[in-house]
Swiss-Prot record:
One of its GO terms (cellular component) is membrane. Disruption phenotype: Completely abolishes the production of asperfuranone. Produces a large amount of intermediates including 2,4-dihydroxy-6-(5,7-dimethyl-2-oxo-trans-3-trans-5-nonadienyl)-3-methylbenzaldehyde. Signal peptide: none annotated. Glycans are attached at N352. It comes from the Eukaryota. The lineage of its organism: Eukaryota, Fungi, Dikarya, Ascomycota, Pezizomycotina. Its EC number is 1.-.-.-. FAD binds at E41, L145, D320. It holds the Pfam family DAO. It is a single-pass membrane protein. Belongs to the paxM FAD-dependent monooxygenase family. This is FAD-dependent monooxygenase afoD. The chain crosses the membrane at residues 10-30. It comes from Emericella nidulans (strain FGSC A4 / ATCC 38163 / CBS 112.46 / NRRL 194 / M139) (Aspergillus nidulans). Keywords: FAD, Flavoprotein, Glycoprotein, Membrane, Monooxygenase, Oxidoreductase, Transmembrane, Transmembrane helix.
Length: 440
């Protein structure tokens, strides 16, 4: 093939994992007409995930830059907090539901909601909206990655569990907390190859709004709130246009996790009630709304062993594969959105600015730049998020259940998330890449 023809050959980009960040990354690349994008999803079809989560204003700005259609999809399904504050309530000491609903008696601290500006949604509903935006034949289901090889001048070779072998110029692994790509990239024996149990677990329930109102009161049930107490805390908010109330009950676990990489084990309402048996009556009533049989979800993260880098050669990790985080900042997925934006911006520069013979080295430079730009902020989040879990559960040294101290610590840490310059991040990535290319 002649050189001028080779220059027109599009990059082939494999995205491993079709979760929220995998889809966003794909849509960001497709929006920029970057190469031929293929998502390899291990499931046989899109899973119906009922869990809820939320995105900050910073994350939504990144979505808009990735592809405005992503933000439109979120807007269709998101629940906004109608109040200007998020309150953190004492779930432990109130002796009556009336006392528990009295802000003067039971609010530990409150935060201006405008700073984080969360939009909450059901994960599966938002995922379905984004999936509709994908062109046909972009997704291949039933493709569980088992290994890859990245060497020489050839493309990256991907090996799947079904025996199929594929090739790509670039691999972006969004394959989650227990990432196969991470283990290959770092080596199976590397301390950071596997996420570790954070000693926190969570139980989830979607309860009818009338029952939530009975337990918490009308005002509390219609906004995002948290209840704090010893060794546990509850985060709850309305979803699905306030028809359903989403409840997460988090607990501290002093035991090791004995189920390997299995993150979900059967549990029961009895375990929930035991965790809050000495709490206020409103919390016990809310806990009683959980189903009799439910699941206990272990929270794994990379706080004990952060990754030394997020990219090697022509393979990059993004989202939980790079920086698996506990959910206590409410910003783990938001960090993945930032990852996707930086990757899209840098790969656009590779495609538009590289001759064919330079593309391999420039791909590697772009992915290294991505890693360098994203690693400090995202790893700070992983560490701080685990510590925030202890803060909510009155385990943080010298603070305990002191609402004034809790608020000061919350604001100090959370400001790092919301006081962030997205354009500055993009400019930093572009400029660092351009400097790297010049040096070659």
């Amino acid at each position: 093939m002649a050189d001028h023809e080779q220059e027109q050959e599009p990059l082939s980009i494999a995205i491993i994992g079709g979760g929220i960040i995998g889809l966003m990354t794909a849509l960001g690349l497709l929006h920029r007409n970057i190469g031929k994008v293929t998502i390899y999803e291990r499931a046989s079809a899109w899973p119906d995930i009922g869990a809820a989560f939320a995105f900050t204003g910073i994350a939504r700005e990144c979505m808009q830059r990735l592809d405005p259609a992503i933000l439109s999809a979120l807007s269709k399904v998101a629940q906004r907090n109608p109040h200007d504050k998020v309150r953190y309530w004492d779930g432990f000491h109130p002796k009556s539901k009336e006392e528990a609903q009295d802000p003067e008696k039971s609010v530990l601290f409150e935060i201006e909601e405008k700073n984080m500006a969360y939009w909450a949604c059901l994960r599966g509903v938002f995922h379905a909206e984004m999936a509709r935006l994908l062109p046909e034949r972009v997704v291949r289901f039933g493709k569980r990655l088992v290994a890859y090889e990245d060497g020489g001048d050839q493309k990256v070779v991907l090996r799947f569990e079904d025996g199929e072998v594929e090739e790509a110029d670039i691999v972006i692994a969004c394959d989650g907390v227990h990432s196969t790509a991470r283990r290959v990239l770092l080596g199976a024996e590397h301390p950071a190859a596997n996420a570790r149990y954070s000693r926190k677990a969570v139980y989830r329930a979607l309860v009818p709004m009338p029952a939530a109102i009975d337990a918490l009161g009308t005002e509390k049930a219609h906004v995002q709130i948290a209840h704090c107490g010893p060794d546990a805390h509850i985060v709850s908010f309305p979803v699905n246009n306030a028809q359903i109330y989403n409840v997460f009950l988090f607990t501290h676990d002093s035991n090791e996790w004995t189920h390997g990489h299995t993150m979900t084990v059967p549990s029961s309402k009895e375990e929930i009630l035991s965790a809050v048996e000495n709490w206020g009556p409103h919390i016990k009533e809310l806990a009683s709304l959980f189903p009799e049989q439910l699941s206990k979800y272990a929270i794994f993260d990379q706080a004990d062993h952060p990754l030394p880098y997020y990219a090697a050669g022509r393979v990059a990790l993004a989202g939980d594969a790079a920086h698996a985080s506990s959910p206590f900042h409410g910003a783990g997925a938001c960090m993945g959105v930032e990852d996707a934006l930086v990757l899209a911006e840098l790969l656009e520069k590779v495609q538009n600015g590289s001759a064919f013979k330079e593309k391999k080295s420039n791909i590697e430079l772009a992915l290294k730049t991505y890693s360098d730009v994203r690693i400090e902020r995202s790893q700070w989040l992983v560490k701080s998020s685990r510590e925030m879990g202890d803060l909510y559960e009155w385990r943080y040294e010298d603070i305990g259940g002191d609402g004034v101290k809790c608020k000061a610590e919350w604001e100090r840490r959370s400001r790092v998330i919301w006081d962030f310059d997205v354009q500055g991040m993009v400019d930093q990535a572009r400029e660092a890449y351009e400097r790297a290319v010049v040096k070659v």
